[in-house]
């Protein structure tokens, strides 16, 4: 299998099973692995990705009227080169890091644009391509009260004058 070097881009992506906090799960009982899954709505693209070695899975339909859905798990690693994650809420962009990315687990996500980078692995002759988040732009839906009571930067307090050690009494 040829080495995959191209990034994947998903505009207006549908993400599922978010675990940005890295909480323990059935598949990661110890926890610490931050992941989410991205839907791949185009069956031809999903097959091409499988052929390249990406780990594309199929989610069985819940209802008989539904179709199976191709998807892929994406890892979120904050190492030497952390992903660029921008949260947009009420037009304000906030850069998220490993300390605050967990808020996306419960956020009402309006839209997501993703860039996923490949990691080609080879373990004892078995090969494949793991998906790692490179960049993500997440627009969050805010309710009208969140907008109304949105935190503004508080005015800075005056710093007390230097104390020379003498008490005023």
Per-region residue spans from a language model:
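OB-fold ssDNA-binding interfaces and closely related basic DNA-contact patches used
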Residues: 1-82
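Acidic, gly/ser/pro-rich intrinsically disordered tails
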Residues: 1-4, 142-169
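Residue-level recognition of well-ordered beta-strand positions that form the cores
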Residues: 37-39, 115-117, 137
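Beta-hairpin (beta-strand-turn-beta-strand) motif
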Residues: 41, 79, 117-121, 141
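A beta-strand/beta-hairpin structural motif
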Residues: 73-82, 87-101
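Exposed beta-sheet edge/beta-hairpin loop segments within beta-rich domains
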Residues: 91-112, 119-130
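OB-fold/S1-family single-stranded nucleic acid-binding modules
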Residues: 123-144
């Amino acid at each position: 299998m040829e080495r995959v070097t191209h990034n994947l881009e998903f505009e207006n992506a549908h993400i599922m099973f978010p675990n940005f906090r890295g909480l323990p799960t059935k598949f990661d009982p110890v926890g610490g692995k931050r992941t989410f899954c991205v839907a791949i709505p185009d069956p031809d693209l999903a097959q091409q990705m499988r052929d390249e070695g990406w780990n594309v899975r199929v989610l069985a339909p819940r209802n008989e009227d539904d179709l199976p859905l191709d998807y892929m798990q994406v890892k979120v690693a904050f190492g030497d080169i952390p992903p660029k994650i921008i949260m947009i809420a009420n037009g304000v962009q906030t850069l998220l890091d490993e300390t605050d990315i967990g808020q996306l687990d419960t956020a009402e996500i309006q839209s997501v644009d993703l860039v996923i980078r490949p990691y080609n692995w080879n373990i004892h002759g078995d090969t494949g391509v793991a998906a790692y988040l490179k960049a993500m732009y997440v627009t969050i839906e805010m309710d009208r009260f969140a907008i109304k009571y949105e935190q503004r930067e508080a005015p800075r307090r005056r710093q007390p004058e230097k104390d020379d050690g003498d008490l005023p009494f």
